[in-house]
């Protein structure tokens, strides 16, 4: 099980990016997303996509990040904080891949310093500044089994690969 925890979300500024964090998580193998802020718009957008395109994916806002992390660890899960200051992904991915319950923290603004100590792994997708969406996508591609070949049961819409154009089927 892989779940994303989005912290530092600022509703007026980060709605689009946080929505894309959730959509990326869903498409690339995560089971759900917690948002440590109150933003029904983001929740509604992600749930709408999950409803139309299928698959099981939950999204929940108004989650206290500190208590979420503590609860996750008490339940036997590991916490991975994506940060450019962490250990390089290729150096830890094999070990992380063996874990059954992974909470992936994706920050928006500067994260609290104690988060680095709370995480079991501080992981960098390069030690260079870039998008948190890109970092999550690369991380999930390396960690989630067969993420690029997933099926999404219960879809109302299906997109088919097409070398030149669009093929979309309403189910």
From Swiss-Prot:
Similarity comment text for this entry: Belongs to the aTrm56 family.
Keyword Nucleotidyltransferase among record annotations: no
Ranges in a coiled coil: none
Pfam families xrefs: Trm56 (PF01994)
Domain of life the protein comes from: Archaea
Protein name: tRNA (cytidine(56)-2'-O)-methyltransferase
GO cellular component: cytoplasm
Compartments, as annotated in UniProt: Cytoplasm
Organism: Methanospirillum hungatei JF-1 (strain ATCC 27890 / DSM 864 / NBRC 100397 / JF-1)
S-S bridge residues: none
GO MF annotation, one: tRNA (cytidine(56)-2'-O)-methyltransferase activity
Keyword vocabulary terms for this entry: Cytoplasm, Methyltransferase, S-adenosyl-L-methionine, Transferase, tRNA processing
EC assignment: 2.1.1.206
Job of this protein: Specifically catalyzes the AdoMet-dependent 2'-O-ribose methylation of cytidine at position 56 in tRNAs.
Binding locations of S-adenosyl-L-methionine: 82, 107-111
Broad class of where this protein is predominantly found: cytoplasm
Reaction catalyzed: cytidine(56) in tRNA + S-adenosyl-L-methionine = 2'-O-methylcytidine(56) in tRNA + S-adenosyl-L-homocysteine + H(+)
Self-association state and partner proteins as the record states: Homodimer.
Single Gene Ontology BP annotation: tRNA nucleoside ribose methylation
Gene3D superfamilies: 3.40.1280.10
